[in-house]
A protein has these predicted regions:
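Histidine-dependent nucleotide/RNA phosphoesterase domain, centered on the 2H-phosphoesterase fold
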Residues: 1-202
């Protein structure tokens, strides 16, 4: 099965993003837009694994320790570059705990021979993809310009700063991803709770 590790959005943040999408999807009608219910923050993509390997990965993930932390979603950008946009995303902003969690997960599954990440952790929410080649930053060199997001870029520039609110990340999740013509379907296989934030009340 095809798996990855991520963080789900809370309902309020998801609803704000859904309302935003309803207002901007028409500005890039040729793009493949992500369904709001499928939005998530990816911590580590793993790919195809056997059921036995999935269980071994789950066992490693149970050993990962992290406290809950705040995440703010806002701002936007395009991969691989604004001149050759193939992915439209909104930013995810958090303290060092977020990157530390991603690094801990990366190290935990590396014990099973899963390749380590070769680029810095850059959390984001993918909202839409253009057709053709991957929008991965690895395509940065030699990627051809395209006009899929041209109108959207102009509209976004006129909107000012995007802010979809703040949420608390209190767990990370092992997902299964099933590909289909209508878009990927994500199933939550297992949840891994994080320590609650320290109580600062007197």
């Amino acid at each position: 099965m095809r798996i990855f590790i991520g963080i789900d959005l809370d309902p309020e943040v998801r609803a704000r993003i859904e309302r935003f999408l309803e207002g901007v999807e028409s500005f890039a009608p040729d793009a493949r837009w992500v369904r709001p219910e499928s939005l998530h923050i990816t911590l580590k993509f793993i790919g195809e694994q056997s059921p036995d390997r999935v269980e071994a990965i789950s066992e490693r993930l149970r050993r990962v320790e992290s406290g809950a932390f705040e995440i703010r979603s806002g701002g936007y950008g395009f991969f691989p570059t604004a001149k050759a946009p193939r992915v439209f995303w909104i930013g995810i902003h958090a303290g060092p705990q977020f990157a530390e969690l991603a690094a801990s997960i990366d190290m935990a599954v590396a014990e099973l021979g899963i390749p380590r990440e070769d680029r810095p952790f850059s959390p984001h929410l993918t909202l839409a993809r253009a057709g053709g080649r991957s929008g991965s930053p690895k395509w940065r060199k030699g990627d051809a310009p395209n006009a899929t997001f041209a109108v959207l870029e102009k509209r976004l520039a006129a909107m000012g700063e995007l802010d979809f609110g703040t949420m608390t990340a209190h767990e990370f999740i092992l997902y299964q991803s099933q590909l289909s013509p209508g878009g990927s379907k994500y199933t939550k296989l297992q949840r891994f709770p994080m320590r609650p934030p320290a109580n600062t009340a007197e």
